[in-house]
């Protein structure tokens, strides 16, 4: 409250503070028409504080005024009276010594108590002895103490108990509020407020209800919060978890198992092996385990406060260290395409998985590879040289895979047809002849040379120096494999001549189809130190992406041949002493049939005339022809002749062509109109001249 600007009466009521600001003076001389009112400042007052009953619109020319406790003027309830003329204040029966009256009639009450609550009446006496009254009021509230929370259950059990929190103390005219983790109460069917919100009940408490709870009390003059209360919910134990999750161990390892179960208070643990109690610890340690330590391991968790027990069982398997595997074979030297081989993974062990690898890869899918029921034996049927391996087998248990050393299969094969090099067959006198023979074989082949059927030597190479024309002949290389018992020979014709022979042209395709086939011409023979040349129609080869030379220009390839490639091809060979050309070879390109042409072009005729139609289509070989009139087969000729035609011969005339060599067909349709004698054979809408061209693929020629 602010101090007044005008002093109270002189009698012994000390000034304690100013209650009215300078603006209050404006109310001392209000207009006489305004109604007298009292304003309580503040309206809600805390115990021990003060309140000012502020007078508004006080009338002029007053004799005095008095304050009363209550809503009416009662001498027994007078607090104080004031005479303006003498400026004297007189206390009444209800005066407590805490009241101060001011010349403007306002009343200050200090050190407010609960009994001060209520109405106060100001009685004003004017100079003309006319009275006027006004009533004001205020309410007194206590200053709230700091609340606290009490609980009916300090250790509730999860999913079983309910907890009732009560905000203390119980205070009249107070509002109660609750917070959980400093947040307003969540909406939940398990939370219930009662007793004017003073009691918070949690039904079927869970571990998630373990939170910070606070209550608050409020009234119009104060608000206080309690200290936090943490709810201690007893729960568990949950189903224990045994770690690590590994259930397979090698013999000789240490077994170290740990058990954990969510629980409040923390659980007590016990271990059982195959149903036999071991120890009451959270961890179980067994050093240097053996196969005998295999079994079921049970962890039991117990909560003495909740009275609950939970168990978890894990099965531990201890494996003996397996030996390193190795591979045995029933045939150490199998013959290609004759023998089968059975590879067996040793040793035989129970409860073991057998695995196989070939060339460090898993076994390919092949009808020639067969595994036994237990996968321990791998059988290769009709072995080939590609089956040499290496092969590995493995034995696998829950812990590891052990590999054998690799085994290489020694497949006996060959000899294949020998190859004689170099490939030259033509030599000049005076040079050295050096021939080498090679045949794929295991073990390596033994070689022999024969000339014109006569044994020369048992070596892989044949060398003859300073050859003459007498050295011309048949040179045979014979390869022998004593292990497989097989022999193979290759014969090569060697010609020794000072002059180059007349070359010839060979072809890989004597009748290529246009726009489909490629043709490779090769100039024969292959001769040492020889240059090969080509001509087409007596001219050097044109530049074309469809023409390609290879094999030292000895081979000429024509890609996607066309009918224009049907020319005369000549090859030539030359060396330092001679040159020669082949006879020309004409390429026979099969093509067509193209779209046929019907002649003459006339389509209108007079009745009585002869109709003579001829059909022609470019094709190699020449095509076969057939005719149809209005879709009806007629004859298989190139020319269609009808004497003395009539209007009945009107219609569509189709010529079909077919090339059996290329497998292609084609056709053309022509409309023929025959007019009666004496009429003009002009073109009408019904006799429009037109040629409808189309390829009728798959139409059978009749």
Curated annotation (Swiss-Prot):
Record PROSITE patterns: IG_LIKE
Bilayer topology term: Lipid-anchor; GPI-anchor
InterPro entries the record matches: CEA_cell_adhesion, Ig-like_dom, Ig-like_dom_sf, Ig-like_fold, Ig_sub, Ig_sub2, Ig_V-set
Pfam family, one: V-set
S-S bridge residues: 167-215, 259-299, 345-393, 437-477, 523-571, 615-655
Propeptide span(s): 686-702
Reported impact of residue 78 to L/R: Abolishes dimerization. Reduced affinity for E.coli Dr adhesins
Subcellular location: Cell membrane; Apical cell membrane; Cell surface
Domain named Ig-like C2-type: residues: 145-232, 240-315, 323-410, 418-495, 501-588, 593-675
An example Gene Ontology biological process: homophilic cell adhesion via plasma membrane adhesion molecules
Gene Ontology MF: a single term: GPI anchor binding
Tissues in which the protein is found: Expressed in columnar epithelial and goblet cells of the colon (at protein level). Found in adenocarcinomas of endodermally derived digestive system epithelium and fetal colon.
Phenotype when changing residue 68 to A: Abolishes dimerization
Modification after translation (UniProt): Complex immunoreactive glycoprotein with a MW of 180 kDa comprising 60% carbohydrate.
Signal sequence interval, chain numbering: 1-34
Effect annotated for changing residue 68 to F: No effect on dimerization
Entry keywords, A to Z: Apoptosis, Cell adhesion, Cell membrane, Disulfide bond, Glycoprotein, GPI-anchor, Immunoglobulin domain, Lipoprotein, Membrane, Oncogene, Repeat, Signal
Occurrences of domain Ig-like V-type (ranges): 35-144
Lipidation (GPI-anchor amidated alanine): 685
Mutation effect (residue 66 to N): Abolishes dimerization
Function: Cell surface glycoprotein that plays a role in cell adhesion, intracellular signaling and tumor progression. Mediates homophilic and heterophilic cell adhesion with other carcinoembryonic antigen-related cell adhesion molecules, such as CEACAM6. Plays a role as an oncogene by promoting tumor progression; induces resistance to anoikis of colorectal carcinoma cells. (Microbial infection) Receptor for E.coli Dr adhesins. Binding of E.coli Dr adhesins leads to dissociation of the homodimer.
Family as reported in the entry's similarity comment: Belongs to the immunoglobulin superfamily. CEA family.
Subunit structure: Homodimer.
Protein name listed in UniProt: Cell adhesion molecule CEACAM5
Gene from which the chain derives: CEACAM5
């Amino acid at each position: 409250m602010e101090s007044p600007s005008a002093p109270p009466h002189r009698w012994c009521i000390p000034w304690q503070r100013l209650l009215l600001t300078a603006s209050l003076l404006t109310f001392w001389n209000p207009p006489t028409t305004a109604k007298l009112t009292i304003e309580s400042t503040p309206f809600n007052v805390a115990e021990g504080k003060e309140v000012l009953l502020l007078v508004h619109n006080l009338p002029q020319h007053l004799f005095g005024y008095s304050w009363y406790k209550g809503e009416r003027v009662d001498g027994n309830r007078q607090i104080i009276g004031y005479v303006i003329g003498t400026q004297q204040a007189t206390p009444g029966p209800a005066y407590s010594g805490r009241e101060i009256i001011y010349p403007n009639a306002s009343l200050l009450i200090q050190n407010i108590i609960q009994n001060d609550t209520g109405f106060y009446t100001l009685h004003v006496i004017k100079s003309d002895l006319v009275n006027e009254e006004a009533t004001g009021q205020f309410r007194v509230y206590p200053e709230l103490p700091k609340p606290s929370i009490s609980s009916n259950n300090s250790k509730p059990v999860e999913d079983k108990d309910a907890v009732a929190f009560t905000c203390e103390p119980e205070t009249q005219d107070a509002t109660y509020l609750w917070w959980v983790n400093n947040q307003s109460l969540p909406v939940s069917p398990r939370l219930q407020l009662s007793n004017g919100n003073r009691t918070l009940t949690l039904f079927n408490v869970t571990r998630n209800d373990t939170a910070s709870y606070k209550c608050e009390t409020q009234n119009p003059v104060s608000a206080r919060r309690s200290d936090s209360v943490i709810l201690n919910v007893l729960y568990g134990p949950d189903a224990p978890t045994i770690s690590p999750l590994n259930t397979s161990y090698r013999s000789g390892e240490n077994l170290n198992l740990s058990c954990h179960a969510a629980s409040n208070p923390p659980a007590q643990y016990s271990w059982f092996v195959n149903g036999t109690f071991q120890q009451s610890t959270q961890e179980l340690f067994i050093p240097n385990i053996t196969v005998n330590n295999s079994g079921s391991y049970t962890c039991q968790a117990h909560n003495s406060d909740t009275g609950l027990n939970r168990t978890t069982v894990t099965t531990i398997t201890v494996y003996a260290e397996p030996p390193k595997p190795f591979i045995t074979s029933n045939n150490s030297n199998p013959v290609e395409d004759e023998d089968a081989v059975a590879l067996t993974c040793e040793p035989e062990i129970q409860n073991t998985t057998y695995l196989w690898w070939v060339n460090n890869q898993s076994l390919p899918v092949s009808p020639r590879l067969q595994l036994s029921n237990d996968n321990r034996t791998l059988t290769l049927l009709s072995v080939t040289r590609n089956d040499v391996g290496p092969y590995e087998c493995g034995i696998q248990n829950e812990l590891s895979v052990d590999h054998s050393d690799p085994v290489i299969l020694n497949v006996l094969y060959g000899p294949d047809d020998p190859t004689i090099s170099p490939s030259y067959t033509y030599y000049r006198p005076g040079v050295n002849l050096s021939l080498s023979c090679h045949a794929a074989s295991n073990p390596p082949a033994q070689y022999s040379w024969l000339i014109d059927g006569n044994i020369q030597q048992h070596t892989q190479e044949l060398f003859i120096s300073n050859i003459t024309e007498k050295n011309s002949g048949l040179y045979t290389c014979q390869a022998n494999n004593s292990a497989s018992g097989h022999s193979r020979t290759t014969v090569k014709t060697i010609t020794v001549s000072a002059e180059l022979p007349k070359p010839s042209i060979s072809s890989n395709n004597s009748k290529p189809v246009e726009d489909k086939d490629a043709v490779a011409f090769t100039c024969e023979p292959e001769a040492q130190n020889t240059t090969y040349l080509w001509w087409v129609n007596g001219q050097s080869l044109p530049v074309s992406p469809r023409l390609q030379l290879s094999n030292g220009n000895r081979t000429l390839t024509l890609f996607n041949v066309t009918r224009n490639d049907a020319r005369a091809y000549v090859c030539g060979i030359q060396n330092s002493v001679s040159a020669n050309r082949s006879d020309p070879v004409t390429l026979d390109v099969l093509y067509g049939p193209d779209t046929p042409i019907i002649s003459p072009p006339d389509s209108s005729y007079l009745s009585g005339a002869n109709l003579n139609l001829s059909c022609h289509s470019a094709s190699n070989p020449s095509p076969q022809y057939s005719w149809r009139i209005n879709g009806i087969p007629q004859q298989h000729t190139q020319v269609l002749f009808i004497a003395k035609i009539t209007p009945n011969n009107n219609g569509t005339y189709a010529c079909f062509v077919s090339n059996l060599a290329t497998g292609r067909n084609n056709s053309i349709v022509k409309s023929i109109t025959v007019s009666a004698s004496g009429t003009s054979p002009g073109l009408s809408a019904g006799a429009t001249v037109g040629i409808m061209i189309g390829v009728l693929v798959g139409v059978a020629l009749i």
